[in-house]
Each structure stands twice: as C-alpha cells, then as structure tokens.
From Swiss-Prot:
Catalytic activity annotation: S-ubiquitinyl-[E2 ubiquitin-conjugating enzyme]-L-cysteine + [acceptor protein]-L-lysine = [E2 ubiquitin-conjugating enzyme]-L-cysteine + N(6)-ubiquitinyl-[acceptor protein]-L-lysine
Signal peptide boundaries: none
Protein name per the record: RING finger protein 37
Organism: Homo sapiens (Human)
Pathway: Protein modification; protein ubiquitination
GO-annotated molecular function: ubiquitin protein ligase binding; ubiquitin-ubiquitin ligase activity; zinc ion binding
C-alpha cells in the first residue's frame, strides 16, 4: 500500500517562484476544498518558463510514483518537465504542534544547489505524465504494490537514482516547467506523489501516518493499489460529505466513463449541447466557443480558433455539427445522466409581444373557459385561451408547442388552392403593406377607394380577423391585420399610433379605442362582443 503524499491530511506545503492567476493558485494542488483542487494551478498569462513548483513534505518520504496532469490550460501547453529532489530537512517534526500550525505557503525551501535532477521528459501530444521508481520496495506495515498496466494516453518515464538519498530520503520535490507551446500558459491540473515514509522515520511518525490514512480512506479503497493515470479521482479525502454518499459518486463516475469521448468538449470535458465544427477540425461546444471569443475580445483580439489561434474569416467559420448533435441526443435518450437536459429547443418568438402582465379578469376568464368548448378550434378551451400566448410568454416548451398548434387557423379559414409563396411574392406583399400603411391616413388615397372596395375590406376584416400567435399576414389577407373599426392596416411600418387588442382577438387603433371607451358599454365592431376596459392589451409589432 502506498499513499498519496499530496493529500491535505498529510500536511504538505507548496510554493511557486512565479505569480499565479486569480483562482488558480499553486495551493489548489494540495487544497482541502475539492472545488479549488479541481481548478488546478496556472500562472499569469505573461509568465514564461522556467517555472518551479516545490512541494515540501513534513517527513522524509520514499517516492514510488509521481503523476502529473497538465490539462489545466484547456489544451496542450506544457511540453517540457524536469523533476528535482532534495534531502535537506530544515523543518520540525511532522507530529509536533509547531508543524501543525504552519500554513501551506510557508515551506522552508533549500537553495537551488541542494536539488538533484532525477527525471526529465519532453511531450508532444500528451498531457499526462507518470514518473516511476523502478527500485521501489514496499516495507511493513505497508503492503506490496500491485502491478498496474500503463495507459497509452499517458507518458511513462522512469526516475533516475542519483544516490542513496535522491529517491528514498526526499524532503522536497521540485517540478520545473521548462517548455510551453507558443504562447501557452504554464499550468498543472493535478499533482500526486505516491510513496511511503522513509526508513529514517520514527515509529511514532509511521503510526501517526497509518492512523491518518485509516481515518480518511474507506476500507476498500485503503487496501487496494491505485490505478493510472490519476489515482486520487476516487479518494474521498477528509471531508465527511464525501463519505456520506460514496455510492452516488461512484455511480456518476461509472456513467461518465461510458460517455464516448467524441461527445465531450475537449476544453471543459462536459457533454456538448450544441457541437460546433472548427476550421481546425476540432469540435467544441457553442457556449465554450462564445466564452473563448469573449475572452479574446477583452484583449482586443478578433474571434479565432481556440486550438490554432487562427482568426475566423468569411470563408473559414465554425459550423454546427448536426450529425454529432443527433448522436448526442440519441445517447442522452438512452442513458440518464444527472444534470444533462440538452434535448430542449428554444421557444419560437411570437409576432406580437404584450406590454402588460396577466390581469385578474383574464385569470378569471381562463378559469371559466375550462367548462366552455371552443367552437373555432374544436378543442377544449381549458388547454389554452385565445390570449394565453400573449399573457404567458414564459411558459414551458411543451406548453408553447401546444399553444402554437392550438392557435393555428383551422382548415376552413385557409386557402389551400395556392402553394407556398415565393420570394418575389413575399417581397411584393411586403411592399404593398408598407405602401398601404404609409398612404392609409391620407384622404387623397382613401378617397379613391369605391364603396365596393370598402365593403370588401370590411368583410375580409370580419371573416379573417387577425389572431394572436399567428403571423402578421393571413392567407386571405394581402395587406395584413387592420383596425376592426376604421380598417387602417397595421404593419411593422406603422409607427404613428399604438395598437390595442381586444379579448376577442381583433385590433383597434388609439382613436377608435378612445371612441369606444366614451360610449359604454364597449363592444367590438367586428363581432359585437362586450369588452371590459381592463381586458384591453397594447401590442407591439
């Protein structure tokens, strides 16, 4: 049995010779807070190698293996590492009260000349390194270490034995980041030093270590050898919260292991709700790409590929990945992953947006409508009232889909003789609407309309009245929605006066509404239904 000497219960201390970024201090590597530990260590963006990270142990240790994860920068940044050890023990005993009061940022680090180079590695595309001691032998009461199979994604490097004290009597371990790629940031995501107390440690220190180990690890975890590449992923640490629900954490870990790697964002390691294909061939989530673009914008740089740094051009843009999105959705339907709700779709925007909230009278109408069938739509009014899409814009996705389907005009009101409108027809209708709304208030324009044309407009306005939740144009109407009283056409170009909607769905302009309010009781001109003044809503195009 070997122990992870970087766990906080063994009170290691750590120090870096360079400035760290906010929230990514070097103390995160040995922190008791699991959130801080997951952030890892990262220097400021202007720091260049070499960067020295020194870990000081409160007792001399014999190193078995050193695991280093270098993915804290979101990509492959670090390409060169060197390992140094020192046997100088300028510190107090581990189990003394004085050592218990020292903080993690107060290590007594020896001079540079006291360190011995024991390992070196150059990385190409890997981000995890394992330095192992071939001559390590476990001693009682520490059991024999089981053999572990190396992972192909991890670089395995042997430590060099530079003397009797270089690996078996270590007081300080120094990690030197020697090279980074391009403008990369020196970083360490995770650090683990596995070993056992040195032969020179007293029996009292060994007993204390065994006691701490047995108190902070479950029985089944304490008796098994760690697995590559990062053994502390399943260590519950010394927090009681993690000991209370080990089964849920283990279940979540098993589920995450079953997720295909292509479904995970390579930067955040989370399932991608909206995968985007980058010009470099990499696939990341849309939210991750937006965060990268915002980060670039803070430094005055244009949006670029996070992996290559090449700026986007009109001919080289990130594109959605629909086939991968379909596979991710299918996978989530087959597997239940906590916290993943990625199959929803955005609610479609309505053509009309109310400027008021639900009024008490409307709420009473909705409750009363539960027992009255709707003859126009052929469904129960208990599902949705005619004004429900306007007064409930923040309903759920399922409700919004039902409202959209319910408020569609029935087949008896639709002209099925014509096919879908072409672009030229839509453009022509848009020009007619703009022209009619502009000239509608001019007497010289309205005087040219004959009595038959006015009667036709009035009949069309009463038969094909504009309903909320539908588009700005009905199949039988060319000019669009209009005032039920004066027949003035409303459109996005109509900016002179506000528009109001009655509970029956018909629209009124401001002057006509004022006339209706002066003559009580107020009724709709088109359908002759009574209208309460508090039920009138102002709508916007």
């Amino acid at each position: 049995m070997v122990i992870n000497l970087c766990l906080p219960q063994f009170r290691p201390r750590i120090h870096c010779n360079k400035i760290s970024a906010d929230g990514y201090e070097v103390e995160n590597l040995i922190s008791e807070d699991l959130t801080k530990r997951s952030h890892g260590f990262r220097t400021e963006y202007f720091i260049k190698p070499p960067v020295y990270v020194t870990v000081s142990f409160p007792f001399n240790v014999e190193i078995c293996r050193i695991n280093i994860d270098l993915t804290a920068g979101g990509g492959q940044n670090v390409t060169g590492l060197e390992m140094y050890t020192s046997a100088s023990s300028s510190r107090v005993s581990w189990n003394t009260p004085q050592c218990r009061t020292l903080g993690p940022a107060e290590p007594s680090v020896p001079d540079k000349e006291a360190f011995t180079l024991v390992g070196k590695v150059l990385l190409k595309n890997q981000s995890q390194v394992v330095f192992s001691h071939r001559g390590f032998k476990a001693r009682p009461p520490f059991g024999a270490m089981e053999a572990t199979l190396p992972s192909p994604a991890v670089v395995a490097q042997e430590l060099w034995n530079k003397g009797a004290l270089s690996l078996s009597h270590v007081a300080h371990l120094r990690i030197c980041i020697t090279h980074v790629t391009g403008g990369g940031i020196p970083c360490i995501k995770r650090l683990e030093v596995w070993g056992q107390p040195a032969k020179t440690c007293s029996q009292e220190v060994i007993d204390s270590i065994l006691l701490v180990t047995s108190e902070n690890l479950p029985q089944d975890v304490a008796l098994q050898a760690p697995a590559l590449p990062m053994e502390s992923d399943c260590d519950p640490g010394d927090q009681p919260e993690s000991q209370q629900a080990p089964s849920s954490l283990q279940k979540l870990a098993e589920i995450i292991q079953d997720v295909p790697e292509e479904f995970l964002d390579p930067i955040t390691l989370e399932i991608m709700p909206c995968p985007m294909l980058l010009p470099s061939g990499k696939v990341i989530d849309q939210s991750t790409l937006e965060k990268c673009n915002r980060s670039e914008a803070t430094w005055g740089r244009v949006p670029s590929d996070p992996f290559t740094g090449v700026a986007f051009t009109p001919h080289s843009q990130p594109l959605p990945h629909p086939s991968l999105k379909a596979r991710i959705d299918h996978f989530l339907l087959q597997h239940s992953i906590p916290g993943c709700h990625l199959l929803g779709r955005a609610q479609t925007a309505l053509a009309v947006i109310p400027s008021s909230i639900v009024l008490p009278s409307q709420k009473r109408k909705i409750e009363q409508a539960e027992h009255v069938p709707d003859s126009n739509f052929g469904v129960n009014a208990s599902c949705f009232s005619a004004t429900s899409p306007l007064v409930l814009p923040t309903t759920s996705e399922h409700t919004a889909k039902k409202m959209k389907a319910t408020n569609e005009p029935s087949l008896t009101h639709m002209d099925c003789s014509t096919g879908p409108l072409s672009h030229e027809q839509k453009l022509s209708q848009s020009l007619e609407i703009a022209l009619a709304s502009t000239l509608g208030s001019m007497p010289s324009f309205t005087a040219r309309l004959t009595r038959g044309q006015l009667q036709h407009l009035g009949t069309r306005g009463s038969n094909t009245s504009w309903r909320p939740g539908t588009g700005s144009e009905q199949p039988g109407s060319i000019l669009g929605p209009e005032c039920a009283s004066c027949k003035r056409v409303f459109s996005p170009y109509f900016k002179k006066e506000p528009v109001y909607q009655l509970p029956c769905g018909h629209l009124l302009c401001r002057p006509c509404l004022g006339e209706k309010q002066r003559s009580l009781p107020m009724t709709c001109t088109a359908c002759q239904r009574p209208v309460a003044s508090q039920d009138v809503l102002r709508v916007h195009f």
